[in-house]
Amino acid sequence: GLVGSEMCIRDRLTLLRRRDIGFIFQSFNLLPMFTAEQNILMPLTLAGAKPDRQWLRLLVETLGLKERLNHRPNELSGGQQQRVAIARALITKPKLVFADEPTGNLDSVSSAEVLSFLKRSVNELGQTIIMVTHDAVAASYADRALVFADGQIVADVNKPTADQMSELLMKEREAATMN
């Protein structure tokens, strides 16, 4: 009946999200009882899939987590926890990644490494990343940037530069304070 088909649709949506969509949140949502490696592999564990060890190694090395895999979240800095969350979002090689301020808790060097890695995953893996950020430098890594104000798109920039984005964001802040 209807209930059975609703559950079937819900199950299929869950599988789609688990397999084809990655999420990078501002709050890391790491499981405290698991190690960094177990947290990274969680989407694969839930799916009953075997990890691609080469991909895991690339993620871990790029994100600077090699020496931290056996640490639990409370033994990691905020930046390290965010990098674990990013690796977890990318471990399934999702087609689409939603990133909410993915570098918000990282220092400038770690931010640049993470943004470069996200850019590489777009160029080399064909992933699509939708990133929300208030950081002009982070936005400059995008192929396209949309600037929103009051729920409306006020600018659409292809291949944005940090200077362009900084200027646009400043204009929007000034406009918001005048209203």
Regions flagged by a language model, labelled:
Residues 5-6, 10-142, 147-148:
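ABC family nucleotide-binding domain
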